Structures are given as C-alpha cells and as structure tokens.
C-alpha cells in the first residue's frame, strides 16, 4: 500500500517524473507479487527454504542485499552496484524526494 501511495502521490509529480524518466533506470522489487515462477527460477534460502513466488524472491533479495525488507525502500546505486547515497523509506515529501534523487545524481557524477 505504501509503495503504491508513493507512486501515486510523489512519483506522479512532474519534477519527480522528469528526473526518473531522464536520469534513472528504475528497478522495482514488488514483494506482493504472488506469481509462481518456473522451477528453474526458484531460489533456496540460506536456511533451505525454497521460494517459488516472485514476491517472496524479491523480499529475500532485498533482505540479503540491503539488510532491509521494508516497503517502500528506495536505493540509488551506481553501475558498480554500490550505494550512491543512503537509502530512503516511506516519506511523502516531494521536495525531499527530489533532493534525494538529485543527491544521487551528484554522487554518481562525482564518481565518474
């Protein structure tokens, strides 16, 4: 619900949309997707549990990669997969989200 609210109330802002469309590649990991994947795409967790749905696999990936399974959780990464700036969670502040995106761009350009 919070992810959809962020998309509807923050991402829909013209300034945010322009930055997202022009300056970022968006990868969304939906944890509520119940689609069962083909067996060749199932994931076995460290504890031996087999994850079959896209949502469960996405949740596991987020937890293993970022140490967090909170939704929404925005991560800005460079091409090397390293964080550009600290991640951001649920916050409906449009100016805050714009600043977050711009800080990621600045960090990216400073690394080049």
Model-flagged regions — what are they?
Residues 8-12, 45-54, 61-111:
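Non-catalytic, surface beta->alpha helical segment in thiol-disulfide oxidoreductase systems
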Residues 1-4, 74:
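The canonical Cys-X-X-Cys-His
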Residues 7-57:
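Thiol-based oxidoreductase modules, predominantly thioredoxin-like and allied folds used
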